[in-house]
Amino acid sequence: MSGYILAIDQGTTSTRSMLFDRNMRVVGLGQQEFTQHFPSSGWVEHDAEEIWKSVQSTIRIALAQAGISAADVAAIGITNQRKTTVVWDRISGKPVHRAIVWQDRRTAQFCDELKRRNLEPLFTEKTGLLLDPYFSGTKLAWLLNHVPGLRERAQKGQVCFGTIDSWLIYKLTGGKAHVTDATNASRTLIYHIGENRWDDELLDILGIPAAMLPEVKDCAADFGMTDPALFGVSIPILGVAGDQQAAVIGNACFEPGMMKSTYGTGCFALLNTGTDRVTSSNRLLTTIAYRLDGVTTYALEGSIFIAGAAVQWLRDEMGFISVASEVSALAEKADPNQRIYLVPAFTGLGAPYWDAEARGAIFGLTRGTGRAEFARAALESVAYQTFDLLEAMQGDWKGATNHTVLRVDGGMVASDWTMQRLADILNAPVDRPVFLETTVLGAAWLAASRAGIWPDRKGFSERWQRDCRFEPAMPEKERESAIAGWRDSVSRCLTRPQ
């Protein structure tokens, strides 16, 4: 049977290729980790060629596991780590430098210099982003300034810039396509999300030649055909989205007011604001959720640096648990009369505080505080931080009501206790889907719907399946008291007043 969909999920630490059949069932999976390079303090790099090899390898593993050939694959969808920056020679296809990863902080001083020139409002107005090293623009400027001869080659159109999706499409098509999608473009710091174009003024400020930029397409579009030398046949690449936006799609959050939150090492929450390009007054990011049929849907995005990483800390540094899965059962044993707060600012605090110098702290310890109370505090910190994001979103946009339902995914959502506490603190329902791999599902749907094999948005939304809905059950006075304690704890960790 033909009509299979291949979804490539190129992440920060590993690459996965997943095959779906016509009924949206997973029939094959390949996964491979790759090397993390740390050449200097705060620097993080990937070998783009190693990533490309991991994609080829995982595709072959998935095909073998499914027992099918590449000729049975109708379309390819790609989702990827956002903002990671690659520059390669347009003819040879060889990278000029290792990829600079989104986590890399080498351009912090440059960002500070731009802020001192009072340029952040201009960047935010056009891109919806803040002047931060996370985003691609200052990484690309660094490469142009530090790789000998690169600027001249860029001005002559001899090199290509792209995020990981662009790099993979270029390699998959044998160098024929230099393209990206609107969601990945929206994270570069040089793309005008209101006018859907590369912004000449921002390019000029950062010193980036337009000749090296990819063409920007809808998320479901014709991105090119794979080189038949790779898998024996040409397969159309029909869907692309950055990882967090792909999770919005995979969770079928197609209506304004719908919200998804992904809980992994950190947490990314996105709220669909429809065609409203909301300007945040709470230092949230305004971004493109997806662009389909030429229509741009926007989102407010907030990021939490430490979510599942707090559980890893309990396991690896504190030795309170042996494996992460033990934490929920331990938290359930906590003394309900103790109110312990963990502010996990191990690497600063993200949205809406954006305090890079804040550091973690624990409040409320008594002689009776033990492992169980620490476990509960770690899990509750995720709920409190999500509350901060939702409250900021509600302050920014009238469409974010108290009736918002949160759809969740990621490793932490398997814990019933954590999801119930999340619903209690948010005072909002939390929906956990049957299929938790929503990021790769979103990439698959983009390609499959474009190919006419899977249903359209309405049909896909109807087929989205909920595993469990967690309804808020905490008394309002208890909830208000708990949140007040959290706010007091956070205020003691901040290095600057809010």
UniProtKB/Swiss-Prot annotation:
<dbReference type="GO" id="GO:0005829">
    <property type="term" value="C:cytosol"/>
</dbReference>
<keyword id="KW-0808">Transferase</keyword>
<dbReference type="GO" id="GO:0019563">
    <property type="term" value="P:glycerol catabolic process"/>
</dbReference>
<feature type="binding site">
    <location>
        <position position="243"/>
    </location>
    <ligand>
        <name>glycerol</name>
    </ligand>
</feature>
<dbReference type="GO" id="GO:0006071">
    <property type="term" value="P:glycerol metabolic process"/>
</dbReference>
<dbReference type="Pfam" id="PF00370">
    <property type="entry name" value="FGGY_N"/>
</dbReference>
<feature type="binding site">
    <location>
        <position position="134"/>
    </location>
    <ligand>
        <name>glycerol</name>
    </ligand>
</feature>
<feature type="binding site">
    <location>
        <position position="265"/>
    </location>
    <ligand>
        <name>ATP</name>
    </ligand>
</feature>
<feature type="binding site">
    <location>
        <position position="13"/>
    </location>
    <ligand>
        <name>ATP</name>
    </ligand>
</feature>
<keyword id="KW-0547">Nucleotide-binding</keyword>
<dbReference type="GO" id="GO:0005524">
    <property type="term" value="F:ATP binding"/>
</dbReference>
<dbReference type="InterPro" id="IPR005999">
    <property type="entry name" value="Glycerol_kin"/>
</dbReference>
<feature type="binding site">
    <location>
        <position position="411"/>
    </location>
    <ligand>
        <name>ADP</name>
    </ligand>
</feature>
<dbReference type="InterPro" id="IPR018485">
    <property type="entry name" value="FGGY_C"/>
</dbReference>
<comment type="function">
    <text>Key enzyme in the regulation of glycerol uptake and metabolism. Catalyzes the phosphorylation of glycerol to yield sn-glycerol 3-phosphate.</text>
</comment>
<feature type="binding site">
    <location>
        <position position="12"/>
    </location>
    <ligand>
        <name>ADP</name>
    </ligand>
</feature>
<feature type="binding site">
    <location>
        <position position="312"/>
    </location>
    <ligand>
        <name>ATP</name>
    </ligand>
</feature>
<protein>
    <recommendedName>
        <fullName>Glycerol kinase</fullName>
        <ecNumber>2.7.1.30</ecNumber>
    </recommendedName>
</protein>
<dbReference type="InterPro" id="IPR018483">
    <property type="entry name" value="Carb_kinase_FGGY_CS"/>
</dbReference>
<feature type="binding site">
    <location>
        <position position="244"/>
    </location>
    <ligand>
        <name>glycerol</name>
    </ligand>
</feature>
<feature type="binding site">
    <location>
        <position position="411"/>
    </location>
    <ligand>
        <name>ATP</name>
    </ligand>
</feature>
<keyword id="KW-0418">Kinase</keyword>
<comment type="pathway">
    <text>Polyol metabolism; glycerol degradation via glycerol kinase pathway; sn-glycerol 3-phosphate from glycerol: step 1/1.</text>
</comment>
<feature type="binding site">
    <location>
        <position position="82"/>
    </location>
    <ligand>
        <name>sn-glycerol 3-phosphate</name>
    </ligand>
</feature>
<dbReference type="InterPro" id="IPR043129">
    <property type="entry name" value="ATPase_NBD"/>
</dbReference>
<keyword id="KW-0067">ATP-binding</keyword>
<comment type="similarity">
    <text>Belongs to the FGGY kinase family.</text>
</comment>
<feature type="binding site">
    <location>
        <position position="12"/>
    </location>
    <ligand>
        <name>ATP</name>
    </ligand>
</feature>
<feature type="binding site">
    <location>
        <position position="16"/>
    </location>
    <ligand>
        <name>ADP</name>
    </ligand>
</feature>
<feature type="binding site">
    <location>
        <position position="14"/>
    </location>
    <ligand>
        <name>ATP</name>
    </ligand>
</feature>
<dbReference type="InterPro" id="IPR000577">
    <property type="entry name" value="Carb_kinase_FGGY"/>
</dbReference>
<dbReference type="InterPro" id="IPR018484">
    <property type="entry name" value="FGGY_N"/>
</dbReference>
<dbReference type="GO" id="GO:0006072">
    <property type="term" value="P:glycerol-3-phosphate metabolic process"/>
</dbReference>
<feature type="binding site">
    <location>
        <position position="308"/>
    </location>
    <ligand>
        <name>ADP</name>
    </ligand>
</feature>
<feature type="binding site">
    <location>
        <position position="265"/>
    </location>
    <ligand>
        <name>ADP</name>
    </ligand>
</feature>
<feature type="binding site">
    <location>
        <position position="134"/>
    </location>
    <ligand>
        <name>sn-glycerol 3-phosphate</name>
    </ligand>
</feature>
<keyword id="KW-0319">Glycerol metabolism</keyword>
<feature type="binding site">
    <location>
        <position position="308"/>
    </location>
    <ligand>
        <name>ATP</name>
    </ligand>
</feature>
<dbReference type="GO" id="GO:0004370">
    <property type="term" value="F:glycerol kinase activity"/>
</dbReference>
<feature type="binding site">
    <location>
        <position position="82"/>
    </location>
    <ligand>
        <name>glycerol</name>
    </ligand>
</feature>
<feature type="binding site">
    <location>
        <position position="12"/>
    </location>
    <ligand>
        <name>sn-glycerol 3-phosphate</name>
    </ligand>
</feature>
<dbReference type="Pfam" id="PF02782">
    <property type="entry name" value="FGGY_C"/>
</dbReference>
